[in-house]
């Protein structure tokens, strides 16, 4: 099993790189998005959720992510959380069953900030893009996918 880590700033093109690798390896890839491992904020007030810094490593449940990567390496399937940016919470009723595969791609803006996660990766890629291009992609994505406004 090969574990590839793909990191980069918001809107840098990580998803595009993941899609390109997946297309080349045709069905031999499992994708683990860092976004699924955001800590649940359902206990927080609306203001606390708005103020939460999703770009800080403490916002990620790296313990669970690393534990599940290890289980996949051992050939076991895992139940990946489902996180909603709209509610800032993990689904209490649903998970995604993730099965081991020849290649596992872990992608996200913060995945290289955790030493234990880095140690589990065989290949690490950092995706970079122009700041203005990234900003436009992030604004577009946040409005379309995450229910945010331009304000």
Where are these regions (language model features)?
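Hydrophobic positions on the alpha1 helix immediately C-terminal to the Walker A/P-loop
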Residues: 17, 21
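The conserved Walker
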Residues: 10
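Short, structured coil segments at secondary-structure junctions
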Residues: 25-27, 120-121
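Conserved lysine of the Walker
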Residues: 14
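Short hydrophobic/aromatic beta-strand immediately N-terminal to the Walker A/P-loop
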Residues: 3-5
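ATP-dependent NMP and nucleoside kinases share a basic, alpha-helical "lid"
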Residues: 91-146
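Conserved nucleotide-sensing/catalytic segment adjacent to the nucleotide-binding pocket
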Residues: 30-33, 39-87
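P-loop/Walker A phosphate-binding loop and immediately adjacent motor/lid segment at beta-alpha junctions
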Residues: 49-50, 66, 78-79, 86-90, ...
């Amino acid at each position: 099993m090969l574990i590839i880590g793909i990191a980069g700033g918001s809107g840098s093109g990580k998803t595009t790189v993941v899609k390109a690798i997946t297309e080349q390896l045709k069905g031999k890839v499992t994708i683990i998005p860092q976004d699924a491992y955001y800590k649940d904020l359902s206990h927080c007030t609306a203001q606390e959720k708005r103020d939460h810094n999703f770009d800080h490593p403490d916002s990620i449940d790296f313990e669970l992510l690393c534990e599940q990567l290890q289980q996949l390496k051992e050939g076991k399937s895992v139940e990946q959380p489902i996180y909603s940016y709209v509610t800032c919470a993990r689904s209490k009723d649903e998970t995604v069953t993730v099965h081991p595969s020849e290649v596992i791609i872990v992608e996200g803006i913060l995945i290289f900030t955790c030493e234990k996660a880095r140690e589990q990766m065989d290949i690490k890629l950092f995706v970079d893009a122009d700041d203005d291009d990234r900003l436009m992609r992030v604004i577009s994505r946040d409005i379309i996918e995450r229910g945010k406004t331009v304000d």
